[in-house]
Amino acid sequence: MAGLAAVMLVLAYFLAKWQTKRLVRPIYELDLEHPLENKTYEELTPFLEAMDRQNKEKEAVSNMRKEFSANVSHELKTPLTSISGYAEIMKNGMVRPEDITLFSERIYKEARRLITLVEDIIKLSKLDEESVELEKQDVDLYELTREIISRLAPQAAQKNIRMEVTGEPVNYFGIRQILDEMIYNVCENAVKYNVENGRVSVWVGNTLDGPKVTVSDTGIGIPQEHHERIFERFYRVDKSHSKERGGTGLGLSIVKHGALLH
């Protein structure tokens, strides 16, 4: 009797092992790269759908990184090529004395463009990593905006653009440096993409939803079809005139990340 029980126990063990392998085999054979293409147990569908979403998110992040790297390489190469070209011509003595100042100005502008681009990339990297170590404090948005408008006055004067700030003093608990970057970038865009003899109006005040800064201008505007992409890095609505306006294509990305940080 004891021998029969032992035999039955051994048979039960091997039967359970065989049955388990049969049940688990479809799971082992899953294509984890394309989980929804697998034909398996219905109970696994929610798990496979979640895995598919994660795979798509990872792929999107990977594509964004590749695109960002390609854009950075292109944006860095363009001014460096110009600087190298102008410098080589001057080095070889191929510039007339009366053109030296012109070439020097072009080299300076390209160098400033390069510096601005690197600074913007560093700012975005810090915001991405949330490594901004500055403490939050009460910031008077009205006074901050007046300072920013004052800094932009020379740039606005080149196109005879009138800038004005209206509203009232309003405190906001945030990181002053980031708030400065956000408001500055929006106001600078309002100047860059404005028309001659145009106007930029900024309103600062309290609303039912809290403190608010509104910027309006008489500029060329942004076509509706571009609205969803204007916060993407290096995205420009008018690529043909981006260089002459001096933008890096990162300003609104900094605004977006600054807003998310707050």
Predicted regions and their residues:
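Short beta-strand/loop element within the Bergerat-fold HATPase_c
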Residues: 197-209
